[in-house]
Curated annotation (Swiss-Prot):
SUPFAM superfamilies: Zn-binding ribosomal proteins
Keyword terms of this UniProt record: Metal-binding, Ribonucleoprotein, Ribosomal protein, Zinc, Zinc-finger
Induction remarks: Down-regulated by UV-C treatment.
HAMAP family: Ribosomal_eS27
Gene behind the chain: RPS27B
Keyword Ribonucleoprotein attributed: yes
Zinc finger (C4-type): 39-61
Functional summary from the UniProt entry: May be involved in the elimination of damaged mRNA after UV irradiation.
Protein family according to the UniProt entry: Belongs to the eukaryotic ribosomal protein eS27 family.
Entry protein name: Small ribosomal subunit protein eS27y
Top-rank taxon: Eukaryota
Length: 86
């Protein structure tokens, strides 16, 4: 008997795996990452941790790039970011 809602447990869809808890995925992986943040004033690029717990300021112009929340850091409006590669 085959049910309509059967899911292949060895090859789950990527969107289902991304929503699962980091320890309950088929292959464990963290939710955090490093990113390059570009300052809106001087266009200087700074590497920032996605879940940083301190305020991050630009090295050149002392502009605040991101502020901690409770989980992911909140980027300042106007700042652009790019996720760092592996």
């Amino acid at each position: 008997m085959v049910l309509q809602n059967d899911i292949d447990l060895l090859n789950p869809p990527a969107e289902l795996e991304k929503r699962k808890h980091k320890l309950k995925r088929l292959v464990q992986s963290p939710n955090s990452f490093f990113m390059d943040v570009k300052c809106q004033g001087c266009f200087n690029i700074t590497t920032v941790f996605s879940h940083s717990q301190t305020v991050v300021v630009c090295g050149n112009c002392q502009t605040i790039l991101c502020q901690p929340t409770g989980g992911k850091a909140k980027l300042t409006e106007g700042c652009s970011f790019r996720r760092k590669g592996d």
